[in-house]
Amino acid sequence: ESANQVTIITEQKDNAVPIETRYKRISTIEKAGAICSLLEVRLITGRPHQIRAHLSSIGHPILGDRKYGNKKSLEISKALNIPYQLLSACSVTFPEMKGTFGYLSGKEFIIHQIYEFIHSVFVK
């Protein structure tokens, strides 16, 4: 799964595009002998694969992510029967904007089923 994979670098290069990701830990649990954390992630820039590549580059790959995961995260994913990346939006918030998509300006949409499922696993 190396096709269409991005790389995170720490020094500026000519063709590099900067990214900014903010995250905070919501809760932590132990599963399959590993410490797993639920994160709230906010994209300041929105690049393809940004969350997956950034978290993996700092040693915290997303469970089930065959493209950016490491050996340990993939072993944990297998033990927990997680066949796909455990990454989902619980809400989408649109910035203030005008024009064609102005009707979405400042609106937030919450996906309650995902939110409830994640909290049933991580927040007790």
Locations of regions flagged by a protein language model:
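RNA pseudouridine synthases
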Residues: E1-K124
